[in-house]
């Protein structure tokens, strides 16, 4: 099931607290459950997207940049900020 805005907000807040630079929302197309992937400052967000998107029944749905305004990103239809 697609993640709710509330769930995504919680994941983004957790990412901010842990010092992540981005939160990637990934859908497992086996059971259609969404989950977060946290990108640390020593990781490449593009690499983290590439190793997941379209592989092993995974689909990257959104990318939140934690250095940008979170509320604006949450209001977008599909956030994609690498």
Feature names for model-found ranges:
Residues 1-18:
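Short N-terminal "domain-start" leader segments
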Residues 5-9, 45, 70:
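Short amphipathic alpha-helical segments that mediate assembly, nucleic-acid/protein binding
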Residues 31-43:
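A short, exposed loop/beta-hairpin motif centered on an aromatic-Gly-Thr core
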């Amino acid at each position: 099931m697609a993640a709710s805005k509330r769930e995504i907000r919680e994941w983004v807040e957790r990412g901010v607290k842990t010092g992540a630079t981005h939160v990637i929302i990934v859908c497992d197309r086996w059971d259609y459950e969404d989950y977060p992937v946290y990108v640390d400052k020593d990781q490449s967000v593009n690499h983290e997207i590439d190793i997941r998107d379209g592989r092993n029944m995974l689909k990257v749905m959104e990318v939140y940049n934690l250095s940008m305004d979170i509320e604006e990103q949450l209001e977008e239809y599909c956030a994609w900020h690498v």
